[in-house]
Structures are given as structure tokens and as C-alpha cells.
């Protein structure tokens, strides 16, 4: 590391400490990142304080090639950005070489996926409670929860789409639901026989309630919107999961939406079809499920290739 780079780093850290009150851990983190970049560039004959955009990009590319996480790369760029802004503000440079660089995006965590077995436990418990509930108030809630779950797992709707369904969608025995999704875009999603049956049982009881004719929502409630709040559904789902012997934290409407997509892919559906069913405008959003396809292909080769282990 050249003396000039070393001096520039020390001046920067002194400013961060004296003028901005940076914590010791922050200063040490800045030092590690800046000295690592300086040493790498010095090995190529480049002074960090005089580095250009291409040099900075090269250090980030090296980190990526060495397997550093996107968060580590972003932290390195943040330190360099602060460093060069300091040099610019102090008149040591006429530009900021990091100005047009972007931090690498953090990898999206894989969605939580509930197994087919556990989804089955949830649905079986919901059906049991719907059949056994005797008190009118409990019965309508149990039938509603069963209808919600069967419909969600059959269609993969967003929770906002599900609780906001108009009652007209359940007035027929059609095998498809017309759903209005994000951006007011309509899509057709198939509805299983079990989901249709659960909806009809709920609808029969719903229609017998006073004032039901005046409410346009399939799942009416005393709320600002007039329909069931998604938070209420999520809370009831967690309670059901606990009663089914599952961890309450493992169950949510979003987890069941992911289960719908993942189980379809595991059983042979293609990514484009799942994209359409989920209502994703861009295939890149659906690509979080590619790990499911990879697992399916690996299993396929393992089971059918003559030389597989």
C-alpha cells in the first residue's frame, strides 16, 4: 500500500471520527475495506487515492469471484464511496469514481415452503372443525376458514385478492375464478372441486345471515373495507396450524401461496404457467422457484439415468 493511499485513509478515518462521531467498530470496518482495496490496487500499480471507476469495479468483481456475499461487496463499495466523497470535498480529487457504481443486489431469500403433508394436515383440520362446529358463530367462522384455505391452496391467490373476492365469483359452479390482481389486471385461475364445495357450504350459511344480501364481498366483515381483513385471516390461520400440531410460525397466507407454486412445479408444471397463475407481470419474480425445478431435475436424473449413483 503506497504512502499516499495510507495517508488518505488515515485522514478520512480521522474526519469520520472527529466530525461525524463514527463508532470504533465502524471505523475499523472502513479501515479493513479501504486497506484491502488499496493493497489489491497497489499490486496492480494503482494508487487507491487516484483510482478510476474501472479500478473500483475491478475490486468489486474480484470480491464476487472470490465468493464474497453481496452484502460484503455492498459494504466495500459504501466505504469506498464515503472515502472518495471525502477526497472530493477536500479538493484532493475533481471527481468521484464511485458515482456511477451500484451495489450488488442482495439475494432474495428462498420462500418458506410448507410440505404437501403439512398442507394436508391444515386442510384436514379445517374441514374437521367446519363439520363439527355447532354454535352458529363458531360454525360460520370455521366454514369461512375452510373455504379460505381450500381456495388459497387451489389458486395461489395473493391474500389481498382472496379476502377481497366479490360474492359473485361463488354464485356459479364454474371451475374457474376471475381474479382482479395488481394493476387491475384480470386473470383466470382454476378452482378445484374441494375448493368449490367448501365455498358453497360457506356461501349457503353466509346467505342466511341478516344483511348478507347488501354486502358485495364473499367474505364480509365489520371492517373499513367491508370484507375480512387479511390480518384476521392470518391470525386465524396460525391458530389453526397450532391446533393441527404445526408450528404457528410456519403458517401464513403467503406461505400457502408459495406452497401452491412449489407443489405445482414439483409435479411437472412449467415456470411460465406458474407465472400466469400467480399473476406475476415479470417472469423474473417467479424465478425464485427455480430451486424447485433444479431439485426436480436432479431427482429425475438420479432415478432414471442408467449411470446415476
From Swiss-Prot:
All residue ranges annotated as the Tyr recombinase domain in the record: 109-302
UniProt domain Core-binding (CB): residue ranges: 3-88
Keywords: Cell cycle, Cell division, Chromosome partition, Cytoplasm, DNA integration, DNA recombination, DNA-binding
Listed GO biological process terms: cell division; chromosome segregation; DNA transposition
Presence of keyword Ion transport: no
Active-site residues, Swiss-Prot/TrEMBL: 158, 182, 254, 257, 280, 289 (o-(3'-phospho-dna)-tyrosine intermediate)
GO CC terms in record: cytoplasm
Keyword DNA-binding applies: yes
Transmembrane region(s): none
Protein known as: Tyrosine recombinase XerD
Gene that specifies this protein: xerD
Amino acid at each position: 500500500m503506497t504512502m499516499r493511499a495510507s495517508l488518505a485513509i488515515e485522514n478520512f478515518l480521522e474526519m469520520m471520527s472527529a466530525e461525524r462521531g463514527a463508532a470504533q467498530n465502524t471505523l475499523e470496518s472502513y479501515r479493513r475495506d479501504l486497506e484491502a482495496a488499496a493493497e489489491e490496487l497497489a499490486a496492480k500499480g494503482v494508487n487507491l487515492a487516484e483510482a478510476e471507476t474501472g479500478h473500483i469495479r475491478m475490486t468489486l468483481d474480484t470480491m464476487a469471484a472470490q465468493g464474497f456475499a453481496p452484502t460484503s461487496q455492498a459494504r466495500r463499495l459504501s466505504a469506498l464511496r464515503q472515502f472518495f466523497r471525502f477526497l472530493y470535498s477536500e479538493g484532493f480529487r475533481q471527481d468521484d469514481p464511485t458515482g456511477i457504481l451500484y451495489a450488488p443486489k442482495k439475494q432474495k431469500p428462498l420462500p418458506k415452503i410448507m410440505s404437501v403433508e403439512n398442507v394436508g394436515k391444515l386442510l384436514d383440520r379445517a374441514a374437521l372443525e367446519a363439520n363439527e362446529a355447532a354454535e352458529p358463530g363458531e360454525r360460520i367462522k370455521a366454514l369461512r376458514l375452510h373455504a379460505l384455505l381450500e381456495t388459497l391452496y387451489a389458486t395461489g391467490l395473493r391474500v389481498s385478492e382472496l379476502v377481497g373476492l366479490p360474492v359473485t365469483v361463488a354464485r356459479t359452479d364454474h371451475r374457474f375464478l376471475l381474479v382482479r390482481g395488481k394493476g387491475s389486471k384480470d386473470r383466470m385461475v382454476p378452482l378445484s372441486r374441494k375448493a368449490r364445495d367448501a365455498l358453497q357450504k360457506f356461501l349457503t350459511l353466509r346467505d342466511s345471515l341478516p344483511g348478507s344480501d347488501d354486502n358485495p364481498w364473499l367474505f364480509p366483515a365489520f371492517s373499513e373495507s367491508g370484507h375480512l381483513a387479511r390480518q384476521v385471516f392470518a391470525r386465524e390461520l396460525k391458530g389453526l396450524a397450532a391446533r393441527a400440531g404445526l408450528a404457528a410460525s410456519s403458517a401464513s397466507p403467503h406461505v400457502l401461496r408459495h406452497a401452491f407454486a412449489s407443489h405445482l412445479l414439483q409435479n411437472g408444471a412449467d415456470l411460465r404457467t406458474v407465472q400466469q397463475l400467480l399473476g406475476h407481470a415479470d417472469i423474473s419474480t417467479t424465478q425464485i422457484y427455480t430451486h424447485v425445478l433444479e431439485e426436480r431435475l436432479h431427482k429425475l436424473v438420479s432415478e432414471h439415468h442408467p449411470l446415476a449413483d
